């Protein structure tokens, strides 16, 4: 901490993670919090959602604007990695040095938006099946009512990706990986308290360890 440059590189990611945790508690509009809590409090569906919530750092339980995390961006990155070798234009672009990498990164960001919108809609449908939106036909005439929810969740993903890139540029390490890991760490106390990891079936613990080690190795 005596070196100003190093101190800034360490403190900046911490500040951005504080912002991330704040955003994770900002709910999307139009949510019945009592119904959401009831679904998470019990039943097999609640356990499934609780496991998914582990990787969002509590954002799914709050159905916050950060409920999707940065996973749409991860999906977009994987898609681009698969497309570059098979599309001649992208393959040529990848060989143009920094300019090509910037263009591919830009395309990755563009693809992230529709993926986030689709995943946001899918997540809301999943919660409807769990009983949170029983009074609303999300596929019928009431569909416009959930448009603000979907847009806010997609916007949350875009914001988190931006935070991750700021951490990468101005901090230490890969910002996207740090945000994912921070989300997992933030969800651990609640998962342990609920006894998820302490169950006789060790599948949950093994899965958690494997995913955590994968993220750290990125």
Residue positions per predicted region:
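N-terminal cationic and glycine-rich segments that engage phosphates or anionic surfaces
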Residues: 1-94, 98-218
């Amino acid at each position: 901490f005596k070196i100003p440059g190093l101190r800034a590189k360490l403190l900046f990611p911490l500040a951005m993670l504080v912002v991330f945790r704040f955003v994770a508690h900002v709910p999307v509009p139009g949510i019945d919090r009592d119904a959401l809590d009831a679904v998470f409090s019990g039943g097999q569906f609640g356990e499934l959602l609780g496991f998914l919530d582990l990787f969002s750092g509590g954002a799914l339980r709050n159905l916050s604007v950060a409920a999707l995390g940065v996973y749409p961006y991860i999906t977009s990155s994987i898609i681009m990695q698969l497309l570059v070798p098979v599309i001649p234009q992208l393959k040529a672009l990848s060989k143009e040095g920094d300019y090509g990498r910037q263009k591919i990164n830009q395309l990755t960001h563009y693809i992230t938006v529709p993926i986030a919108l689709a995943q946001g809609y899918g997540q809301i449908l999943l919660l409807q099946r769990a009983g949170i939106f029983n009074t609303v036909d999300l596929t019928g005439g009431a569909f416009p009512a959930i448009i603000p929810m979907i847009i806010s969740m997609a916007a949350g993903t875009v914001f988190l990706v931006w935070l991750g890139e700021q951490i990468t540029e101005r901090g230490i390490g890969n910002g996207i990986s740090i945000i994912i890991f921070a989300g997992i760490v933030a969800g651990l106390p609640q998962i342990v308290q609920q006894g998820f990891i302490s169950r006789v079936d060790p599948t949950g613990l093994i899965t958690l360890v494997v995913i955590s080690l994968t993220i750290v190795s990125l």
